[in-house]
Curated annotation (Swiss-Prot):
Residues 280-290 have a biased composition (Low complexity). Pfam families: Ribosomal_60s, Ribosomal_L10, RL10P_insert. This is Large ribosomal subunit protein uL10. CDD domains: Ribosomal_P0_L10e (cd05795). The keyword DNA damage applies. It comes from Drosophila melanogaster (Fruit fly). One of its GO terms (cellular component) is cytosolic large ribosomal subunit. One of its GO terms (biological process) is ribosome biogenesis. It is found in: Cytoplasm; Nucleus.
Amino acid sequence: MVRENKAAWKAQYFIKVVELFDEFPKCFIVGADNVGSKQMQNIRTSLRGLAVVLMGKNTMMRKAIRGHLENNPQLEKLLPHIKGNVGFVFTKGDLAEVRDKLLESKVRAPARPGAIAPLHVIIPAQNTGLGPEKTSFFQALSIPTKISKGTIEIINDVPILKPGDKVGASEATLLNMLNISPFSYGLIVNQVYDSGSIFSPEILDIKPEDLRAKFQQGVANLAAVCLSVGYPTIASAPHSIANGFKNLLAIAATTEVEFKEATTIKEYIKDPSKFAAAASASAAPAAGGATEKKEEAKKPESESEEEDDDMGFGLFD
């Protein structure tokens, strides 16, 4: 009976995996190390209506996916990433939004002996409030201390763990005595799957403005290279035409070659006074406008002075 129930459960699990991959075009492969059952329940609740969490044995997940490759061969890209304590989070919504929800579900946790530190752990300089009898813990970890007002005081900030270190019994005991919970655990996004493409979660942080800026920089670099080697492309063509026109004007200015665009330049070269006259003519309207504004600004002042004078005479006549 037990064997039949287990076989039926496996069959239902395979069907569920296939249905989820057919229904949802996007999913995360998530790591679930150190995530307890209560925290997992809270995560499922927070994602309700937005995403579906599927956990299971790696062998069963691989078997279900392989059995569905005939209908969806793109799923084969997921197989190399199903290793360790992992699961799937399926969604139809915005990937970045779901990822942020997963990050919010992380909870602080104390350091336990045997755990692997995922980050740097530093004990800050502080008065611990512990009595002198606890000095041995600090000495075992080479932490400089002094006795201040009958309690142990840590003199300097002390790095106690770095990423990849195994937490020892002394480190775990000391951190717990100081009420320091250095780690936070939750579902960690390892890979993102979207309609047949699989990529790193860091890609979700790239914004449209970043893509636009990178594209524009790439076009500018391409144009610069093409200009330097003399190879015409769409990116470099406007610059090549402008440079060619400048060269053509330079040739026309020093030879008898005539064309419409070079006429003005030739006239200025023959008679520089024309250029000076044109420059002064263009500057005159601007200067005239400024003078008029100054005169207009002065007018109200003079008018107000006259009005004041009139008022004065009227009062004392």
